[in-house]
């Protein structure tokens, strides 16, 4: 060993060898100090949770061996448990901590006495209020005769515990209903002005208008043309017609539509009313976005303008199918040349693959105008 060391000293020089030994010693000292202060971590390569194991000792900790063949022994590190806050050590907090335990102990003793009395087939001594409550909760004679003793053993204590909860049940139910109503108002912002039903999107509301209120109007017109032997019970609608009275919801809708149509025309930026070549001309407002335009700017005939004012007319940006209520696939929409309603080519009956040549009229205009419809005039 000594010969090897002397050979290394002669080869590299004594100063270089001494510096190398010093650097090695300092590196080992730094590594040992770093390991002793290293925090626990998860090794990403091995997946092992590495933590300080306290096996790194100093030279001053060495002691003589305690067993045969042992050269050194080191003192065992004491296991230290972290102290936690114990509120029972404070004498001022002890009464507050003992109060719930006494209450639970008292309730447990009371329940134990009741159960013991039930097991002994002796009626428990209860206040009159609890006796009246139990009499009201007894099943009628026609019910199935279950084991009454077992039912009382299982249900007697929960009934007494839930007795105080009945006072606040009404307030909680009212609060839940109010929260549900507010949530519905937020989830369904589109409201029908006629019946008050709410929808999540505008196409659903338009579908509701078309298939509910428009269908009711068509049914009333057909009933007037073909009177039935019995009288309908819609006396309030006939009463409104006789008095020339409009419901409040419809008046609000009409007033809102009138306010929206007071703006300028989106095409000519003119006023709400202007003198056209055909005479006095009023703008038509979209029922969804409120944008308006003159019939001549929209290239409407007099019949189309009159028909557009008879229902919830929509502009080209808001137009959706009058049958399915959807605004998707707008390239498949057909527009009626009499009322300007939109229909998908696959929604009409019979469905068509290509738009028809010339003018086209929807089934509503064909039913109402008959031989005066634009499609009928084109065919003739």
Swiss-Prot record:
It comes from the Eukaryota. InterPro entries: DPF1-3_N (IPR025750), Znf_C2H2_sf (IPR036236), Znf_C2H2_type (IPR013087), Znf_FYVE_PHD (IPR011011), Znf_PHD (IPR001965), Znf_PHD-finger (IPR019787), Znf_RING/FYVE/PHD (IPR013083). The keyword Iron-sulfur does not apply. The keyword Transcription applies. A zinc finger (PHD-type) spans 262-321, 318-368. Its main location: cytoplasm. Pfam families: DPF1-3_N, PHD. Zn(2+) 1 binds at residues 265, 268, 294, 297. Component of neuron-specific chromatin remodeling complex (nBAF complex), a subfamily of ATP-dependent SWI/SNF chromatin remodeling complexes. Zn(2+) 2 binds at residues 286, 289, 315. May have an important role in developing neurons by participating in regulation of cell survival, possibly as a neurospecific transcription factor. Belongs to the neuron-specific chromatin remodeling complex (nBAF complex) and plays a role in neural development. One of its GO terms (cellular component) is nBAF complex. Zn(2+) 4 binds at residues 318, 336, 339, 362, 365. Disulfide bonds: none annotated. Keywords: Cytoplasm, Metal-binding, Neurogenesis, Nucleus, Repeat, Transcription, Transcription regulation, Zinc, Zinc-finger. A zinc finger (C2H2-type) spans 190-213. One of its GO terms (biological process) is nervous system development. Zn(2+) 3 binds at residues 321, 324, 344, 347. It is found in: Cytoplasm; Nucleus. Residues 132-164 are annotated as: Disordered. Belongs to the requiem/DPF family. GO terms for molecular function: zinc ion binding. This is Zinc finger protein neuro-d4. SUPFAM superfamilies: beta-beta-alpha zinc fingers, FYVE/PHD zinc finger. It comes from Gallus gallus (Chicken).
């Amino acid at each position: 060993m000594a010969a090897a060391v002397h050979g290394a000293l002669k080869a590299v020089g004594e100063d270089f060898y001494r510096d190398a030994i010093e650097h090695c010693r300092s590196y080992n000292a730094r590594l040992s100090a770093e390991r002793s202060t290293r925090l626990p971590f998860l090794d990403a390569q091995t997946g092992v949770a590495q933590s300080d194991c306290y096996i790194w000792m100093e030279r001053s900790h060495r002691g003589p061996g305690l067993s045969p063949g042992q050269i050194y022994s080191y003192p065992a590190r004491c296991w230290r448990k972290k102290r936690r806050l114990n509120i029972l050590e404070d004498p001022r907090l002890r009464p507050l901590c003992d109060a719930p335990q006494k209450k639970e102990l008292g309730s447990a003793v009371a329940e134990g006495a009741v159960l013991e009395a039930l097991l002994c087939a002796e009626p428990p001594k209860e206040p009159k209020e609890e006796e009246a409550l139990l009499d009201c909760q007894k099943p009628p004679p026609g019910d199935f005769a279950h084991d009454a003793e077992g039912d009382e053993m299982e249900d007697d204590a929960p009934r007494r515990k839930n007795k105080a909860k009945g006072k606040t049940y009404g307030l909680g139910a009212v609060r839940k209903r109010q929260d549900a109503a507010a949530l519905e108002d937020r989830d369904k912002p589109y409201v029908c002005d006629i019946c008050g039903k709410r929808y999540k999107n505008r196409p659903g509301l338009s579908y509701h208008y078309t298939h509910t209120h428009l269908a009711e109007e068509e049914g009333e017109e057909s009933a007037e043309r073909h009177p039935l032997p019995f009288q309908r019970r819609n006396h309030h609608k006939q009463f409104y017609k006789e008095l020339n009275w409009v419901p409040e919801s419809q008046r609000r809708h009409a007033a809102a539509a009138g306010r929206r149509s007071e703006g300028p025309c989106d095409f000519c930026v003119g006023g709400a009313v202007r003198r056209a070549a055909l005479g006095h001309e009023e703008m038509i407002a979209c029922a969804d976005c409120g944008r308006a335009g003159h019939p001549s700017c929209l290239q409407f005939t007099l019949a189309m303008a009159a028909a557009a004012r008879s229902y919830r007319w929509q502009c080209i940006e808001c137009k959706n199918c009058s049958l399915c209520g959807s605004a998707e696939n707008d390239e498949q929409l057909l527009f009626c040349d009499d009322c300007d309603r939109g229909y998908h080519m696959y929604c009409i009956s019979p469905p068509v693959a290509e738009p028809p040549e010339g003018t086209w009229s929807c089934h509503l205009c064909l039913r109402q105008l008959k031989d005066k419809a634009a499609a009928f005039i084109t065919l003739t």
